[in-house]
Amino acid sequence: MAESSQGRGAVLAAWIGLILGPLLLLACILTDPPGGLSEKAWLTVGLAALMAVWWSTEAIPIPATSLLPILLIPLLDIDTLAKATAPYANPTIFLFLGGFLLGLAMQRWNLHKRIALATLLAVGNQPSRQIAGFMIATAFISMWVSNTATSIMMLPIGLSVIGLLIAGSEEKEGARFAVALLLGIAYSASVGGIATLIGTPPNALLAAFMRENYDVQIGFGQWMLLGLPLSVGMLIFIWWSLTRGGFRLAGGDSRGLLEKEMAALGPMSRAEKMVAVVFVLAAAAWIFQPLLADYID
């Protein structure tokens, strides 16, 4: 019943947004701009309001809303079609696209899961080490894959380990371990995104803003020189905060579970190996792009 009610609410919100968005744009078309604003700026406000309403209510698919400027900017005589379409070919967009495609390929062939399991098997069985392993694996994957996708991938592995490690522990200790591990996954997914330009969209947006407005070029490697140490430092601090204060569990051994999960993946397929090669080459190209720029140009 609750799900049905939520579904009806979403449909109602979409219908309201579908009507409200164009009305806001129409209001800007029919009214004079307030003091200090040009007519084109006022129409841009109306377009922004339309898009904000449609995005927030999902009146139409979100990607379709993102294409409205291509249609409405020249139609409303705000600017030319060439100016309206130029941002869609911004280098930052292609950086996002490359990162997303790489992340999808890793997820398609389970390369990210293999990396995570290998990391967890390497750190040992102590609870504090397991938390460190989860945080390292999550942060590393989040450097290249979206924070949300990384968290979703790591969560079932974490829950399985929690169930295994707390089986022979006291209830209070088990609960503390569970909370620390789940918080570690959540925090490290966000912290890992700081380390690279493609880790999270605001990073690349900042680089694009600095390039376009201040003529300051921030390369992939330059970002990592600052972002990676900051990310590592934050990971260490978070791990220390989560595991200090007598955090210990009496028993539990997750190695068997992790080895079973790794065995279930089987040997690396040809496609997975190719994705790994592309991943290494892409990461190297992003990092060393300033050194290669003279030869490419």
Regions found by a protein language model. Give the residues of each.
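Membrane-embedded alpha-helical segments and adjacent helix-loop junctions characteristic
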Residues: 6, 33, 50, 63-172, ...
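Alpha-helix capping and helix-loop boundary segments enriched in small/acidic/polar residues
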Residues: 37-41, 59, 88, 106, ...
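Hydrophobic transmembrane alpha-helices of multi-pass small-molecule transporters
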Residues: 1-95, 212-214, 222-297
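Charged, alpha-helix-enriched surfaces in structured cytosolic catalytic cores
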Residues: 44, 110, 131, 149, ...
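Gly/Ser/Thr-rich helix-start
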Residues: 22, 59, 104, 147, ...
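Alpha-helical scaffold segments in soluble metabolic enzymes
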Residues: 160, 205, 209, 279, ...
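Membrane-core helix-loop-helix motifs of multi-pass transport proteins
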Residues: 165-248, 263
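Transmembrane alpha-helix interface/packing and boundary motifs in multi-pass membrane proteins
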Residues: 52-61, 137-146, 186-198
